[in-house]
């Protein structure tokens, strides 16, 4: 009888601890979602430039400068300011084939970048579900979150968040775009007014031997 009672006590204690952890993670998800939403409201008042470099087999092939801003609906838009390529353009049929291949590759890179951005701007519902399922550690002033199958089946994402502000320090992603595996790492900085923003992004698509680096610079607050 004593053994049964002891087992029941252990089960009840374990259940209570699990319940408390679930409640804590749910609240953490709400806190992070709130901080991220408030930060987004600050970020949409800025425009900036994005310096993008494309490397193939370790050699720089293209360098573009892009202006980025949010429209009146809060959606991110961009416009190419300049673009320099070291790839020699061929003529005739080969030239057209080269152009088509380049456009396909550009589309692939764009899709990988757009998917990476989605991991930055998650909705409150995603944050709550994420914290319910993910492995979460809070240590040394940081919240570390490891999750799988977040936005796509088989993806893996690792968030590091400042526990004092609930804003990002870094995000590392492993996912698939257009059927091709890729990795993406995003580092964040905080401006003098407290606005948190992606500062450096690196995307690698191994099957295409491509690496893309992106630096966000020259943030200007819109009037």
Where are these regions (language model features)?
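Bacterial N-terminal signal peptides that target proteins for export
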Residues: 1-8
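Bacterial N-terminal signal peptides
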Residues: 8-16
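N-terminal leader/targeting segments and the immediate start of mature chains
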Residues: 19-49
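Flexible, processing/modification-adjacent segments and terminal tails
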Residues: 24, 82-155, 175-178
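Solvent-exposed N-terminal domain segments of exported/luminal and surface proteins
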Residues: 39-93
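Generic beta-strand hydrophobic packing signal
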Residues: 46, 51, 79, 134, ...
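Short, exposed beta-strand/loop patches in secreted or surface proteins that constitute
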Residues: 67-69, 128-138, 159, 188-190
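Gly/Pro-enriched, hydrophobic low-complexity segments
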Residues: 140-223
């Amino acid at each position: 009888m004593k053994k049964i009672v002891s087992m029941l006590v252990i089960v009840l204690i374990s259940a209570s601890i699990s319940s408390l952890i679930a409640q804590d993670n749910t609240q953490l998800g709400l806190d992070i979602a709130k901080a991220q939403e408030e930060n987004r409201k600050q970020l949409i008042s800025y425009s900036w430039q994005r310096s993008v470099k494309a490397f193939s087999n370790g050699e720089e092939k293209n360098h573009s400068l892009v202006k980025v801003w949010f429209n009146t609906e809060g959606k991110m838009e961009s416009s190419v300011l300049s673009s320099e390529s070291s790839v020699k353009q061929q003529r005739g049929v080969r030239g057209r084939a080269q152009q088509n291949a380049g456009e396909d590759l550009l589309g692939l890179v764009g899709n990988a970048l757009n998917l990476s951005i989605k991991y930055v701007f998650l909705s409150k519902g995603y944050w709550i579900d994420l914290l319910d399922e993910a492995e979460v550690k809070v240590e040394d002033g940081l919240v570390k979150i490891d999750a799988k199958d977040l936005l796509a089946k088989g993806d893996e994402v690792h968030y590091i968040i400042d526990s004092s502000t609930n804003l990002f320090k870094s995000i590392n992603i492993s996912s698939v775009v257009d059927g091709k595996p890729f990795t993406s790492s995003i580092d964040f900085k905080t401006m003098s007014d407290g606005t948190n923003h992606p500062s450096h992004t690196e995307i690698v698509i191994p099957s295409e031997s491509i690496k893309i680096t992106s630096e966000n610079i020259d943030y200007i607050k819109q009037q």
